[in-house]
A protein has these predicted regions:
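N-terminal membrane topogenesis motif
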Residues: 1-26, 82, 86, 227-254, ...
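Interfacial/gating helices of multi-pass transporter permease domains
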Residues: 35-55, 185-190, 235-243, 266-294, ...
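Helix-loop junctions and terminal segments of transmembrane helices
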Residues: 62-77, 290, 298-319
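Interfacial segments at transmembrane-helix termini and the short loops linking adjacent helices
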Residues: 111-130, 281, 347-376, 489-490
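Membrane-proximal transmembrane or re-entrant/amphipathic helices at the cytosolic face
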Residues: 478-541
């Protein structure tokens, strides 16, 4: 049973991760040309509005779908199909009401929100355009939480691909159309962000279809054939809220700090000596653009943070603490193996990456990405460690760590952004400090409060060494290739060739180092689809 649960966990994570690869490719197709169409200033407007949207979305969907997934998993483990059905219905109504309230607020008061949250009235059109997404995503997340609680990750993956595909097509089409018509930058940015709303609608329709096709009928039949008497609506709602609200508060802490981060940057930068309002908009746009790449490693880790919830919850219900510890250590180790090389690669190859992907970027862009590449490693580990604590019923502990990290982030902004020699880089430095604090505290909480034995040195040190060697090789190979190909004189094609060569060698070196340092164990490989064949191919013992 324990081995089956661990297999299901990593199989689910693998399905979600495969979808993430497609989603990230589509996302790059969307955001990279989008930034080049509407410019860094326009992308700054887009990003600022998205930050406001993300705050309301986090309040609505960060914790409650996790609670739903956990409660459905527990009900299924205990053989209570009627309780699972009631939990889903309660969750759907609750999420729908929350989504409707926040959507109406954004529709009716876009200018007030733009000024209050990010100190930019020019963002109001973007806020209005993205507002329907809150309601649509709330409803979608109810279906996702229910289906994931049943151990099926495929509909979530397909739904996300549908969402991003529609967003790409609609968003880019509107951005190009408005730009060619000579519309202002705020209007073009609003057209681009409206694609998010249309994509959210497409995802909702797909998840509704999946639920009706695969779950509605069988769930009703299971309930009818069972003698399970579900808990009252009030009791179900209370437990749903009791589990979900602490998780929501924890996630909302970081979303709120992101809003404060955005507001502080936009308040401080224009008044820094030698910058002024126009350059401040450009610098914030560069910072926003770099976050597109900085978020890439976290996107590959998010599937694991989703899949770990029902796996640990089911083990905890059976009081299988050894299994909880095993899943916890595996998830932390695998997240480090994935996140560390990606973060290191972004850091050492920031210059050529920015030059290739974003034409005419501000000179601060590569330096920002170097810092954010380092920060991305801590972000990934914090995502997984938060999910581990939440899945084991320790929902309040991540709130403490995120409050501490957020406070450090604000302090760094206040101290560093206003300094002329640092300015926008202060925000990136603060991000490193913020998530490093969260990771350290979460690891302490896992060891002390979950009563499991985790070998952190074995989980983190081998991939750290492997990533350091890989990063050094990537830096050296790119430098050599750039000289041989005369990158500075030959244009973007030679730049791309040098970058591909560096990345290719880096990947090969990292795979060798993973084997040499035993960053991944044979036990880990057995838990992923085709893992034993891969382990045999890579000589992992």
């Amino acid at each position: 049973m324990a081995e089956e649960n661990r297999q299901n966990f990593l199989h689910g994570a693998a399905i979600l991760a495969a979808g993430v690869v497609v989603i990230k490719i589509l996302g790059a197709i969307y955001k990279i040309p989008l930034r080049n169409i509407i410019g860094e200033t326009g992308y700054g407007y887009f990003f600022a509005a998205y930050t406001i949207y993300n705050f309301f979305l986090t309040i609505s969907t960060a914790g409650l779908p996790v609670a739903l997934s956990r409660m459905i998993s527990e009900a299924n483990t205990l053989g209570r199909p009627c309780q699972a059905r009631r939990t889903f219905r309660v969750a759907m109504v609750t999420l729908g009401v929350l989504g409707l309230v926040f959507t109406l607020l954004m529709l009716l008061f876009p200018t007030e929100m733009a000024i209050a949250f990010v100190s930019k009235a020019t963002v109001s059109r973007c806020v209005f355009a993205i507002s329907p997404s809150v309601l649509l995503v709330c409803l979608t997340s109810a279906f996702r939480g229910y289906i994931q609680g049943n151990g099926n990750m495929k509909p979530t993956t397909v739904g996300q691909v549908v969402e991003v595909l529609v967003k790409v097509v609609v968003g880019l089409a509107l951005a190009i159309w408005f730009t060619r018509m000579g519309k202002s930058v705020p209007v073009s940015a609003a057209g681009a962000i409206f694609g998010v709303s249309v994509g959210s609608l497409a995802a909702l329709l797909y998840m509704l279809w999946s639920y009706l096709k695969e779950y509605r009928g069988p769930a009703a039949l299971k309930c009818a054939a069972s003698d399970d008497v579900p808990d009252s609506v009030g009791r179900t709602l209370w437990r749903f809220v009791r589990i979900g609200v602490p998780i929501t508060l924890g996630a909302s802490v970081m979303s709120l700090f992101s809003l404060i981060d955005t507001k502080l940057i936009n308040m401080q930068l224009p008044h820094v000596p030698g910058i002024g309002p126009a350059l401040a908009d450009e610098l914030y746009g560069a910072y926003s653009t770099m976050t597109t790449l900085y978020n890439l490693p976290a996107a590959f880790i998010t599937p694991m943070s989703i899949a770990v919830v029902p796996a640990i919850s089911a083990a905890a219900v059976r009081r299988a603490r050894g299994e909880v510890g095993s899943i916890t250590e595996s998830s932390l180790r695998i997240s480090a193996v994935i996140a560390m090389p990606m973060g290191a690669g972004l850091a050492v190859l920031a210059g050529p990456i920015v030059e290739l992907m974003f034409r005419d970027s501000n000179a601060a862009g590569p330096v920002i990405l170097t810092y954010l590449g380092i920060a991305s490693v801590f972000v990934c580990i914090s995502l997984v460690s938060n999910a581990i604590l939440q899945a084991d019923g320790k929902e309040t502990l991540p709130i403490i760590s995120m409050l501490a990290g957020g406070a450090v982030k604000i302090a760094c902004n206040l101290l560093l952004v206003s300094r002329p020699e640092i300015h926008i880089l202060g925000a990136a430095i603060g991000t490193i400090a913020c998530y490093a604090v969260i990771c350290i505290l979460n690891c302490i909480f896992i060891s002390r409060n979950m009563k499991v034995s985790i070998r952190y040195g074995k989980a983190f040190l081998p991939p750290l060494v492997s990533s350091a060697v890989m990063a050094a090789c990537a830096w050296a190979v790119y430098g050599l290739a750039a000289r041989l190909l005369h990158v500075g004189q030959s244009g973007r094609i030679m730049l791309a060739a040098a970058l591909v060569a560096a990345i290719g060698i880096a990947v090969a070196v990292y795979l060798v180092m993973v084997i040499v340092t035993r960053s991944v164990t044979l036990e880990d490989m057995k838990l992923i689809p085709k893992g034993q064949k891969i382990a045999k191919l890579l000589h992992i013992r």
